[in-house]
Amino acid sequence: MSEELHSDLIASIFGGKPAKIEEFFSKWNFANAAVSKFDMANSAKNELGDRICEVIENGELTHVLLETIKILSREKDGLEGLLNDPLCDKILAFAELSSNENNSKTVHTLMEAQKCLINTLFHSQRMRDRFYANPKTGENLQFFLGEFEENRRKTSSIDWIRLLNPVQAAEIWYFYHRIAFIATALGREFQKNWANDPKTIDSLLLAVEICTNRSENSTQDINRATEALKTFFNVFCHFHGDVKAIDHKNAAKTCQILRDAICSDVLTDDVVQSAIHCLSVPPLPMVLSVLCGKNSKNNGGENEEEKFFVEELSNMQLTEAILMHLDKQLTKVVALLLNDAPNQQQNPMLSAEASTLTDLVGPYFQVLARLCTDSKYVRRYCRIRVIPPLVSEEVQKRPEENNTLRGRIARIMMLPSSTKDVAAEFLFIICKRSVNRMIKYLGFGHSAGHLANLGLLGQINQPKHASDSEDSETEDYNQIKDSVNPVTGAIYPSDHGSALAGMSEEQKEYEAMKLVDAMNQMMETGIVKPGTIGDDGKIREVSHVLELLKNAPEPAPAENSDSDEE
């Protein structure tokens, strides 16, 4: 690291000729190229910002001083003093965002200004205020996002864009997408403006569309597409009503581009994940004719059933791709959780990584739930893939212990994360919103929370509905289903014999009353608060333990209701 920048040194440097200033800061920038913390007083940063602002428009110094600001802006502390309002405005101008004039005399100056703006937008409220205050910044930024595609670049109305070579254009285009991502992540009013601008979809998704139309993409192309998708999510994720940017035409176009990205064989998992997140935003309708194709009616024939099955599943490419990527992500989460269990004290970061991955799969479940709600074909397909007919081997272990997609989803539902709620809703939908079916596949322990939230606990003891359609239980499962513990979803241990075996009726009554007294004492001291199912189907607290026995329903005879009939 070079010497500390203190006030006397700063005054001495800027008191000299431009060549001296350029020489000093070139050396300082090189020495601090990888540094992110600086032993520099805030007063010195204030003075440095003022001095830089005075001379940065000197063509000899612009590039080197922008690089100095970029390096210093890695550290948030003291940055507001370094960035006075005039300096912020000049950085925006050099990034070609605050006016329609060509302020950067060289490509390298423009790129340095972009990098500088990326750091300062992220760390400085002052820079964000100046950025959002100028309506031109958003307009110019959105224009640039759509102007660097090769054919558009060659015919651009802006001279300096036409003169760029492909490598320079790709780099500058990527940096504008980075700026857009940060700007939309931190400015709600900025999000609103773009969400209601019809040009937003074309500007943002052009970079993604280009990648989906190629058989091979560079790392730069992939990174740019990822930034574009993350920006799209930022813009629309907070809106729950209609927005002007997503009309019927743009909705269909967006769904097509996102579908192509998710089903692509050449894009990375990061791009696919970002595309799935974009598909989950509330304002975007599920255009089934685009996402799943049109299901033609069967005209009959010798192989009518086979023809229907093939036609139905041939449109499930998107659904299968989402399920495949979901399973891949859940496998990573479960592996982290299994590794974390014995080492939680020694490696707390592992828990954080598992938690982050869990949060990132929430939108996968949201998309699947919306698709299943809108399409019975998707719902049937997901049921086949996630909860196929049970076999006896699967209930030898608890649901979360099975090495299946169903097992991994059950494992996620045990975590203190919002993802467990959307995962439970997805499973409930493919269970045809059947309380008994959900308990059968997940056990009451995993299902109770979601059913309580929906006020459906009161339906647990209702009789099942008979159906003559295809049974969802295999023959070997039927042979052992009476041995399955409905709470855990697994068969009882072989030695689970009753604790009351061998007792007389008087002994049983005595033990029962002891239990009642013990529970009542715990209730009075506040150790436990037993609950029962209220009239609204939700849990309410009981005043006495005997309320738990009052009006207890008789067990209803079990009938088959687990068909796939819609």
Curated annotation (Swiss-Prot):
Subcellular location: Cytoplasm, Cell cortex
Tissue: Present throughout the nervous system in juveniles and adults (at protein level).
Presence of the UniProt keyword Chaperone in the record: yes
GO molecular function: G-protein alpha-subunit binding; guanyl-nucleotide exchange factor activity
Predominant place of localization: cytoplasm
Origin superkingdom: Eukaryota
Annotated InterPro entries: Chaperone_Ric-8_A/B (IPR008376), Gua_nucleotide_exch_fac_Ric8 (IPR019318)
A GO CC term attached to the entry: cell cortex
GO biological process, one term: regulation of feeding behavior
Alphabetical UniProt keywords: Chaperone, Cytoplasm, Developmental protein, Guanine-nucleotide releasing factor
Function: Chaperone that specifically binds and folds some, but not all, nascent G alpha proteins prior to G protein heterotrimer formation, promoting their stability and activity. Also acts as a guanine nucleotide exchange factor (GEF) for G alpha proteins by stimulating exchange of bound GDP for free GTP. Able to facilitate synaptic transmission in the nervous system probably by activating G(q)-alpha (egl-30). Also able to activate the G(s)-alpha in synaptic signaling network.
Quaternary state and interactors: Interacts with GDP-bound G-alpha proteins goa-1 and gpa-16. Does not interact with G-alpha proteins when they are in complex with subunits beta and gamma.
Similarity remark: Belongs to the synembryn family.
Protein known as: Chaperone ric-8
Organism: Caenorhabditis elegans
Lineage: Eukaryota, Metazoa, Ecdysozoa, Nematoda, Chromadorea
Gene coding for it: ric-8
